């Protein structure tokens, strides 16, 4: 695999203006496929969820999945699109082994949703409006697995296996209009846009939205034009990018590659590209086809979809609060700073914090536990924080043990470890591990006497007015009591013992 020459991103931005475009494919989580009764289930044995309609057997007829149509309308509404009162399916004709019918049932000039927009908030709060050209319904293709090659791609493979379980799974393809004016923030905008689409479809409940499973896939189009020129440049399309980080890096790389090609005096080739995460680069795929090459024509086996205004309004009434509006509401209610709230969102614990507050914790307590303890443990385990098994009720119970003085913060982290290890509830773990705070002054005074005797110089400093030196004595007591002393009470007793006012 050869990697093309690139210009530095900064040099590219000095000379050229990037124009972006995205086609995001969203797999719908319906029980059955788009046009057949075959199950829509991820991860089953290859070629077990497939029937005659999916394979295009002679004499079989497709039937439109009503739930898929409703999900498509919901997506269109969430993207501020107009919903077509009348739309049709079309056949997109091409031959490839993962398309057993030799055509894909899609929509061409009559999509179900069109002319929308989505406001994207970047990390610094800048809002960038992305205009949506269309959102149309179609079916997914099967999945090819290339065997024998080093990179799992068709190049160099000995043979390929095809799994038709995915063939016919409902898709909504969301196509943007050309995105101009992003400048050096184009890669950041690309990532934020796909993240917003993923968040919206997950919030709607119409897709599992797991990019690692291919539920959300992005084709990223990039072209460059010299500053001041109106006409668009030749674009490339990086296909099936399946992570947010990869979308950002792929757009950045293509900008740098295009700039190097243009600087060399060579023409940019209109083509598809493949993204390689290991080298963070793209390689050439095939010449990019135009719509005419697919010979679209209306699907003769399916009747048009008529979305009455009453039906559309019924679906609109079921839409949940938009994610952006919800974030704004929660930020104001919780009183977090911009940075604090951004960290919460980026860590993926906003829902968990909301549930913890609803369970009885304060906003600050919920953030302290989720951001201060649980997110870090999730990173170490390389899982999502929600997958650790810590419930809002656990956080509330754990924090109450601290507030009631039964355990201190250090013990609380040990209790949390016990919860993660499946040892029981916080109260049960405190009892099993013997983690109660030492509240009897007798043992504390004994430990204080020992600590003062071991550090007489520190004791003299405290008597002399250097009260900040008390930390060393407190530390000695905490060590002697295996962290089970109340540090605040220990400090009070030390000052009383030395006759010093704190």
From Swiss-Prot:
A GO biological-process term: translation
UniProt cross-references to Gene3D superfamilies, sorted A to Z: 1.10.10.410
Claim: Ligase is one of the keywords in the record: yes
Keyword ATP-binding: yes
Function: Allows the formation of correctly charged Asn-tRNA(Asn) or Gln-tRNA(Gln) through the transamidation of misacylated Asp-tRNA(Asn) or Glu-tRNA(Gln) in organisms which lack either or both of asparaginyl-tRNA or glutaminyl-tRNA synthetases. The reaction takes place in the presence of glutamine and ATP through an activated phospho-Asp-tRNA(Asn) or phospho-Glu-tRNA(Gln).
Region entry Disordered, spans: 272-293
Protein family (similarity comment): Belongs to the GatB/GatE family. GatB subfamily.
Keywords associated with the record: ATP-binding, Ligase, Nucleotide-binding, Protein biosynthesis
One Pfam family linked to the record: GatB_Yqey
Superkingdom of this protein's organism: Bacteria
Subunit structure comment from the entry: Heterotrimer of A, B and C subunits.
Enzyme Commission designation: 6.3.5.-
Annotated catalysed reactions: L-glutamyl-tRNA(Gln) + L-glutamine + ATP + H2O = L-glutaminyl-tRNA(Gln) + L-glutamate + ADP + phosphate + H(+); L-aspartyl-tRNA(Asn) + L-glutamine + ATP + H2O = L-asparaginyl-tRNA(Asn) + L-glutamate + ADP + phosphate + 2 H(+)
GO MF entry, a single one: asparaginyl-tRNA synthase (glutamine-hydrolyzing) activity
Organism expressing this protein natively: Paenarthrobacter aurescens (strain TC1)
Name of the molecule in the record: Aspartyl/glutamyl-tRNA(Asn/Gln) amidotransferase subunit B
């Amino acid at each position: 695999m050869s990697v093309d020459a690139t210009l530095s991103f900064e040099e590219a931005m000095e000379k050229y203006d990037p124009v972006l475009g995205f086609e995001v494919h969203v797999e719908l989580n319906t029980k059955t496929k788009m046009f057949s009764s075959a199950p829509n289930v991820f991860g089953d044995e290859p070629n077990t969820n497939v029937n005659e309609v999916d394979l295009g057997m002679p004499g079989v007829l497709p039937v439109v999945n009503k739930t898929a149509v409703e999900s498509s309308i919901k997506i269109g509404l969430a993207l501020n699109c107009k919903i077509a009162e009348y739309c049709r399916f079309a056949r997109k004709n091409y031959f490839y082994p993962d398309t057993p019918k030799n055509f894909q049932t899609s929509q061409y000039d009559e999509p179900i949703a069109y002319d929308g927009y989505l406001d994207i908030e970047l990390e610094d709060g800048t809002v960038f409006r992305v205009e949506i050209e269309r959102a149309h319904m179609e079916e997914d293709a099967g999945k090819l697995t290339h065997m024998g090659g080093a990179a799992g791609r068709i190049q160099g493979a000995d043979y390929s296996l095809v799994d038709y379980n995915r063939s016919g799974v409902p898709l909504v393809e969301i196509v943007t209009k050309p995105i101009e004016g992003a400048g050096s923030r184009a890669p950041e905008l690309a990532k934020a846009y796909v993240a917003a689409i993923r968040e919206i479809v997950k919030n709607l409940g119409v897709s599992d939205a797991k990019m690692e499973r291919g539920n959300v896939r992005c084709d990223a189009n990039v072209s460059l034009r010299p500053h001041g020129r109106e006409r668009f440049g030749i674009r490339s399309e990086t296909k099936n990018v399946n992570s947010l980080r990869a979308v950002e890096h792929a757009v950045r790389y293509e900008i740098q590659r295009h700039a190097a090609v243009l600087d060399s005096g060579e023409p940019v080739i209109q083509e598809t590209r493949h993204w390689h995460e290991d080298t963070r680069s793209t390689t050439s795929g095939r010449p990019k086809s135009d719509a005419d090459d697919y010979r679209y024509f209306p699907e003769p086996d399916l009747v048009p979809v008529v979305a009455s205004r009453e039906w559309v309004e019924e679906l609109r009434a079921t839409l949940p609060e938009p994610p952006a509006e919800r974030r704004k509401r929660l930020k104001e209610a919780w009183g977090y700073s911009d940075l604090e709230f951004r960290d919460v969102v980026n860590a993926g614990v906003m829902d968990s914090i909301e549930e913890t507050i609803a369970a009885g914790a304060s906003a600050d307590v919920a953030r302290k536990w989720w951001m201060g303890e649980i997110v870090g443990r999730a990173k170490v385990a390389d899982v999502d924080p929600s997958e650790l098994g810590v419930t809002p009720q656990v956080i509330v119970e754990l924090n109450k043990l601290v507030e009631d003085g039964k355990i201190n913060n250090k013990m609380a982290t040990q209790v949390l470890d016990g919860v993660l290890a499946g040892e029981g509830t916080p109260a049960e773990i405190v009892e099993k591990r013997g983690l109660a705070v030492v509240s009897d002054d007798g043992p504390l005074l004994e430990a204080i006497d020992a600590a003062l005797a071991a550090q007489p110089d520190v004791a003299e400093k405290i008597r002399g007015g250097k009260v900040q030196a008390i930390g060393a004595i407190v530390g000695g007591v905490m060590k002697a009591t295996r962290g089970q002393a109340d540090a605040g009470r220990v400090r009070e007793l030390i000052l009383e013992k030395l006759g010093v006012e704190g």
